[in-house]
């Protein structure tokens, strides 16, 4: 194992729950406003994960007041307070980019039993 891999391994978080694309997650993010720090919750559907190790990211999509918002979160970021899995969705794709074209009920994902 080289030096870079050793340093990256120390930075990896161990408190990350098991979640996949299609799952609905609630991400608690630390937001700094001026000299204050608060927790902001972003809840939505995971539409993709990419990368490995310290560079791994995941994309969460939600529709708020008719406007779709997608945020990309680094999985091992110290800004993430915690990730809660709200429900597990049943999908057959690794990337759910097709949901961007779907509106309303067509954008729903079946719940895994």
Swiss-Prot record:
This chain's source organism reads Moorella thermoacetica (strain ATCC 39073 / JCM 9320)
Q: Which family does it belong to?
A: Belongs to the bacterial ribosomal protein bL19 family.
Protein name as it appears in the record: Large ribosomal subunit protein bL19
The terms under GO molecular function for this entry are: structural constituent of ribosome
Supply the InterPro entries for this chain: Ribosomal_bL19, Ribosomal_bL19_CS, Ribosomal_bL19_sf, Translation_prot_SH3-like_sf
| Entry function | This protein is located at the 30S-50S ribosomal subunit interface and may play a role in the structure and function of the aminoacyl-tRNA binding site.
What is one cellular component GO term in this UniProt entry? cytosolic large ribosomal subunit
Keywords in alphabetical order, please. Ribonucleoprotein, Ribosomal protein
Gene Ontology terms: biological process: translation
Top-level taxon: Bacteria
């Amino acid at each position: 194992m080289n030096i870079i891999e050793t340093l990256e391994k120390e930075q990896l978080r161990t408190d990350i729950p098991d979640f996949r694309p299609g799952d609905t997650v609630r991400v608690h993010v630390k937001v700094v406003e001026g000299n204050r720090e608060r927790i902001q919750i972003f809840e939505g559907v995971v539409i993709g994960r990419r990368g490995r190790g310290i560079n791994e990211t995941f994309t969460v999509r939600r529709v708020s007041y008719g406007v779709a918002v997608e945020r990309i979160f680094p999985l091992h970021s110290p800004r993430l307070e915690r990730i809660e899995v709200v429900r597990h969705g049943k999908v057959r794709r690794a990337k759910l980019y097709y949901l961007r074209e779907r509106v309303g009920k067509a954008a729903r994902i079946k719940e895994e039993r």
